[in-house]
A protein has these predicted regions:
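Active-site beta-loop-alpha junctions enriched in small/polar residues
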Residues: 7-11, 54, 59-66, 90-93, ...
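Histidine/acidic-residue-rich, glycine-tolerant segments that coordinate divalent metal ions
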Residues: 8-24
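Histidine/acidic residue-rich metal-binding segments in metalloenzymes
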Residues: 19-86, 99-114, 148-164
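Conserved, mostly hydrophobic/aromatic
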Residues: 56, 89, 117, 171, ...
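Short acidic/histidine-rich active-site segments
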Residues: 120-121, 160-185
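Outer-membrane beta-barrel pore domains
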Residues: 128-129, 134-147, 172-182, 194-204
């Protein structure tokens, strides 16, 4: 196993998720914090992932979790991930204000850590506007569900923090619909052509379509090699703090 996402659409014993399921309606809602980021067990998990050479994936986690993993949490005595994490399928909050997307304050931490945001093609995460329905989940906007909007997300990250820190994370295997013009991987040349048409250099386009991920993966391997020389594997059971699973929703036995 070479990478793992720290959560899905539910809190767990290790981290807070961005979105959870409302127990009454069954609808997804913006989450309320459980751990306020990474739990004590989560710090152990991330340390062992670093030692093993596993990519730490921040797609699906809350902003507090993003911040803890990228910048550490001094109160907990947690220095964050020693290797750069990735967002394997997330987009830009400033363009589409979905809790799953990455806000600007976190994008700046992505740059500091040499990390990577891979833009998700899910229509709900690329084309949306604020909603007043009380869920914290924005309203989908059909007219912007296009290849051009995906390019807008990519270029936003590239222009804000540099093209070393943006990639493509389609989520084709996890979504039911796609942006117009990006129905499948055969449309990738059109995406690259649109980036070039907007003035993105050949070199930067190459980073976006793969070289950035290879760079991050190389750094993850280098960190693992260093840690394995001085750090023993975590073989004890990680204490979960009374956390148990209840379907897709976790709860604490207090």
């Amino acid at each position: 196993m070479r990478y793992a996402t720290l959560s899905w659409n539910c809190h767990n014993a290790y981290v807070d998720a961005a979105v959870t399921s409302d127990p009454e309606s069954g609808k997804f809602v913006k989450s309320s914090p459980l751990w306020h980021g990474v739990s004590p067990a989560g710090t152990q998990l991330i340390a062992e992932m670093n030692r093993m050479g596993m990519l730490v994936d921040l797609a699906h986690v809350s902003v507090d979790t993003m911040r803890d993993v990228l910048a550490g949490n001094e109160t907990m005595g947690f220095g964050g991930s020693e290797a750069p994490p990735i967002f394997s399928h997330s987009s830009v909050y400033s363009i589409c204000p979905h809790p799953r997307n990455v806000p600007d304050e976190i994008l700046h931490l992505v740059k500091e850590r040499g990390s990577l945001v891979m833009i998700n093609f899910s229509p709900d995460f690329i084309s949306c506007e604020p909603s007043d329905d009380g869920t914290g989940i924005p309203r989908f906007v059909e007219k912007n569900n296009t290849l051009a909007q995906v390019v807008r997300h990519i270029m936003y990250v590239g222009e804000l923090i540099g093209y070393d820190h943006v990639g493509i994370g389609t989520d084709y295997d996890g979504i039911e619909s796609t942006p117009t013009g990006l129905e499948d991987v055969s449309k990738f040349p059109n995406l690259v052509a649109e980036l070039l048409r907007h003035g993105v250099s050949d070199e930067d386009a190459g980073k976006v379509v793969g070289r950035n991920l290879l760079r991050v993966w190389g750094e993850v391997d280098r960190v693992a090699e260093r840690l394995q020389r001085t750090m023993l594997p975590t073989e004890d059971n990680i204490k979960l703090g009374g956390f148990e699973l209840d379907g897709y929703r976790g709860h604490l036995e207090l």
